[in-house]
Amino acid sequence: IRLSLVGSEMCIRDRDKRHQNLFLLPSAQTKDKTAVSPEQMKKLADELRNEYDYIIMDCPAGIEQGFQNAIAGADRALVVTTPEVSAVRDADRIIGLLEANEITKTHLIVNRLRSDMVKEGNMMSSDDVVDILGIDLIGIVPDDEHIITSTNNGEPLVGSDCLAGQAYMNICKRVMGEDVPYLNLDVKEGFFQKLSAIFKK
């Protein structure tokens, strides 16, 4: 079911055929980003908590109104960053703002990691990023061409056999409290894996 916020009410728009228990609440399609206040978002989150096991709010880049709205009703945060100096610096600032808003349960996702560049010394490792930001790691997503392909095809990557798909699934499991080992990102896809993927399409 797709939900949309109209004034202070929620209305059903359409249903996701593949995931019957997934409900989506899209952001307002308006140029006025102040149309919804943090107080309204907190009220909405509190109401939804009575009906759903998990409520995930996707936060836009930056620290403006969209960020304030997203964290207003949050009790924990997943900070996603790439292993680049500028991105890690931005993530550090975000973590500081989360702490200032009394959101102390934060975890880190390192996105688009390339193990070959890490080995060459041209990219920070996930351990480097964790040391700098000082929060616990919950996921590492490799820089995987399957992400681009799935996005262009409009298909979910979670549950697929590729490394990125496995990484997404493992993050979900860790969020739910499972103890899941981290993937070996040095593994390269072999001929038979590629052949198997072709026949699955």
Could you describe each region identified by the protein language model?
Residues 29-37, 85-86:
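Flexible beta-alpha connector loops of hexameric P-loop NTPases
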Residues 20-29:
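Short, basic/glycine-rich phosphate-binding loops at helix/coil junctions
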Residues 37, 41, 87, 164:
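Short, conserved glycine- and acidic-residue-centered signature motifs
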Residues 151-165:
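C-terminal boundary of histidine-terminating zinc-finger modules
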Residues 136, 166, 170-201:
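P-loop NTP-binding site
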Residues 1-7, 11-12:
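Single conserved hydrophobic/aromatic residue that forms the stacking wall/gate
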Residues 10, 54, 134, 143, ...:
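Generic secondary-structure signature for well-ordered alpha-helical cores
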Residues 43, 47-50, 54, 59-149:
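Conserved catalytic-core segment of NTP-binding enzymes
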